[in-house]
Amino acid sequence: MKVEFAPLNIPLARRLQTTAVFQWVFSFLLLAQCCIGIFICLVLARVWLLLALYVLWLYLDWETPQAGGRRWEWVRNWPVWKYFKDYFPIRLVKTCDLDPQHNYIMGFHPHGVLVAGAFGNFCTNYTGFKELFPGLTPYLHILPFWFRCPFFREYIMSVGLVSASKKSVNHVLSKEDGGNVSIIVTGGAEESLDAHPGSLTLNILKRKGFIKVALKRGAYLVPVFSFGENELFQQVSNPKGSLLRCVQERLQRIMGLAMPLFHARGIFQYSFGLMPYRMPIHTVVGRPIPVKETSHPTQEEIESLHQQYLGALQELFEEHKKRYGIPEHESLIFI
């Protein structure tokens, strides 16, 4: 395989962008393991006082990821996130105003491999969320598993990540005067296995838990489609029924984590590696679907609102696809 190396005279800004994305990929793939390793090293080194203090902290703080987390604006304002945003670049697109007197559930589509668009738009302050949607506070929900990793949990909470448990979503949406936004990647980890370039397959037909929560809380539903999310990585071919796909799905059921085998470019060359391609991401926030609070929603009400949401998502995609390079004949595939 011929390796295409990056030229030496790359501007400093682009080098900083690459560095920013490298630390993000490292954090996503390896930082949790490193933090667990540090914790084990402290045990082996018998640093008992420090360990006792941290274990006590974990005991007292264990429920925080399910109670709105603990964001630090100074972390969300780190300059590294500006370079992260500019690498692709990432752009947040508003289609209409959102009244801060309501709470919202934003369904984010598609998952992609590493959910770069969701992180860049809702976990940093560099794509203009606060300016586009004044009075709203975004909470991006991820697998509860990550909040069990010592030290790593503090880092991911600092940027506004919270648990995807039902308790966590209900807590975010319980704000009586409105202004909170739960961002749920509704396709879940399973959808990442379909994150191939050009793929428009969304795992959503059986995903109705967020619909039920929206009805119980009276939270308005907002479809969000991130154009370019699936273009960031190549993935080893894994069609349904293949041996690789069966193994991946089995591991996903056991561990709750999907393991897509992906690759793209490297730091100093463009031929292979785990760095994403420089492809633009346009995250389009659709129009809200009003939802009346219903303490005990029936199955018919859940189905009806789910169909309404699917229609709004399809409409959002069709309205914007040509602008972002999707051929006219292409449409979303719901599975």
From Swiss-Prot:
State its location(s): Endoplasmic reticulum membrane
Q: According to its UniProt record, in which pathway does this protein act?
A: Glycerolipid metabolism; triacylglycerol biosynthesis
Keyword line: Acyltransferase, Endoplasmic reticulum, Glycerol metabolism, Glycoprotein, Lipid biosynthesis, Lipid metabolism, Membrane, Transferase, Transmembrane, Transmembrane helix
* Alphabetical list of Pfam families matching this protein: DAGAT
One GO cellular component, as annotated: endoplasmic reticulum membrane
The regions listed as transmembrane in this protein's record are 24-44, 47-67
Positions annotated with a glycan in the UniProt record: N125, N180
Recorded topology in the membrane: Multi-pass membrane protein
Give a GO molecular function annotation for the protein: 2-acylglycerol O-acyltransferase activity
Q: Name one GO biological process term.
A: diacylglycerol biosynthetic process
On the tree of life, the source organism's domain of life is: Eukaryota
User: Which InterPro entries does the UniProt record give?
Assistant: DAGAT
Top-rank EC class of the record's enzyme: transferase
Q: Which residues form the signal peptide?
A: none
Query: What reactions does this protein catalyze?
Result: a 2-acylglycerol + an acyl-CoA = a 1,2-diacylglycerol + CoA; a 2-acylglycerol + an acyl-CoA = a 1,2-diacyl-sn-glycerol + CoA; a 2-acylglycerol + an acyl-CoA = a 2,3-diacyl-sn-glycerol + CoA; a 1-acylglycerol + an acyl-CoA = a 1,2-diacylglycerol + CoA
Function of the molecule: Involved in glycerolipid synthesis and lipid metabolism. Catalyzes the formation of diacylglycerol, the precursor of triacylglycerol, by transferring the acyl chain of a fatty acyl-CoA to a monoacylglycerol, mainly at the sn-1 or sn-3 positions. It uses both sn-2-monoacylglycerol (2-acylglycerol) and sn-1-monoacylglycerol (1-acyl-sn-glycerol) equally well as substrates, and uses sn-3-monoacylglycerol (3-acyl-sn-glycerol) with lower efficiency.
The name this protein carries in UniProt is 2-acylglycerol O-acyltransferase 1
What is the organism lineage in this UniProt record? Eukaryota, Metazoa, Chordata, Craniata, Vertebrata
Supply the gene name. Answer: mogat1
